[in-house]
């Protein structure tokens, strides 16, 4: 029995390791923000269309669903995602807010002028502070905010 003890311990460790790795879904990144209000900082509004309100706080109070999309002109996946956002922008059921992440206003304006602007409002997060508050893991990243202002 004693000669099988190391084998039993080794198999137990392997089983526990495998059980722990199969249990987690690595495609889902948990966030404590679900059910919380959007953390809003004093970000500069670059441009907006068809809104009386020209600041993010007022628009987040709107009774429409909001889509907050973090993007940058230097981001290749953002370029791939852009036609999808352009298609969504043709629907009027929600507000699309673009957060230009760690980019220049010139770069973002050039990107939107060349490819089209799907956003109802664009804010500049050049230092990445809103991205930090939202738990951003990279760009592009999109959040859906309900009519009550909750993520």
Describe every region a protein language model picked out.
Residues 1-47:
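N-terminal targeting signals for export/organelle localization
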Residues 4, 113-118, 125-151:
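Thiol/disulfide oxidoreductase modules built on the thioredoxin-like
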Residues 41-67:
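A short beta-strand-turn-helix
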Residues 64-66, 70-74, 138:
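Short pre-active-site segment immediately N-terminal to redox-active cysteine/selenocysteine motifs
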Residues 67-68, 96, 142:
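Hydrophobic beta-strand anchors of alpha/beta hydrolase catalytic cores
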Residues 70-87:
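Conserved redox-active cysteine motifs that mediate thiol-disulfide chemistry
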Residues 90-127, 139:
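Conserved segment of the thioredoxin-like fold in thiol-based oxidoreductases
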């Amino acid at each position: 029995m004693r000669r099988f003890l190391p084998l039993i311990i080794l198999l137990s460790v392997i089983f526990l390791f495998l059980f722990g790795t199969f249990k987690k879904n690595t495609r889902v990144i948990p966030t404590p923000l679900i059910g919380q209000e959007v953390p809003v900082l004093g970000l500069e509004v670059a441009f907006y269309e068809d809104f009386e309100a020209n600041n993010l706080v007022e628009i987040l109070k709107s009774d429409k669903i909001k889509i907050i999309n973090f993007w940058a002109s230097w981001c290749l996946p953002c370029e791939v995602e852009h036609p999808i956002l352009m298609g969504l922008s043709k629907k009027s059921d929600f507000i699309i807010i673009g957060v230009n992440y760690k980019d220049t206003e010139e770069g973002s304006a050039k990107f939107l002028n060349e490819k089209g602007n799907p956003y109802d409002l664009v804010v500049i997060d050049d230092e990445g502070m809103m991205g930090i508050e939202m738990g951003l893991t990279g760009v592009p990243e999109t959040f859906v905010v309900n009519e009550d202002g909750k993520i």
